[in-house]
Design a protein with these regions (language model features):
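Conserved active-site neighborhood of the chymotrypsin/trypsin-like protease fold
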Residues: 1-49, 133, 137
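Active-site region of chymotrypsin-like
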Residues: 13, 17-22, 50-139
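Short, solvent-exposed mixed-charge patches
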Residues: 141-144
Length: 144
């Protein structure tokens, strides 16, 4: 596949995969505090793993983009779940399997706190992806 849309502020990339036969996942509704959820991903470069999560809160957070530039504000979920490298970019699902967010980070202070963009925050990128066809640059590589 190739990256056809990239948003460094939201830390989202859309990858076009020609001839992919899998159906798109359905979109769900906004989650509230204490709602159960599911994180799906490939933590630590391993096989697909699905882990339980619970919404701690839905917050408007200000932080850095992927290049370390400050001042990025995003609608996110704070989650009680173990998020590992390899979960980032994976879906946050409701208990019916519908996408309600996109996992993007874990806490540096608490092994059992992760973060996901809300569907509302990811929506502009997802909507623009429908018309995206040409490969785009993802910018310079970063370490860490």
């Amino acid at each position: 596949g190739s990256v056809v849309l990239f948003d460094p502020a939201r830390d989202l990339a859309i990858i076009a995969v020609p001839r992919l036969s899998a159906p798109a996942l359905a979109l769900g509704d906004q989650l509230g505090r204490s709602d159960d959820a599911v994180i799906a991903g490939f933590p630590l470069d391993g096989p697909l793993r699905v882990d339980a999560a619970r919404v701690r809160d839905r917050i408007l957070a200000t932080g850095q983009d992927i290049y370390g530039q400050a001042g990025v504000t995003r609608h996110i979920y704070s989650l009680y779940s173990r998020v590992e490298s390899g979960n980032s970019g994976g879906p946050l699902l409701d208990t019916s399997g519908r996408v309600v967010g996109v996992v993007f980070a874990r806490s540096v202070d608490d092994d059992h706190t992760g973060y996901a963009l809300t569907l509302e925050e990811a929506a502009p990128v997802l909507q623009a992806a429908a018309a995206a066809r040409a490969a785009v640059s993802t910018g310079a590589c970063i370490s860490g």
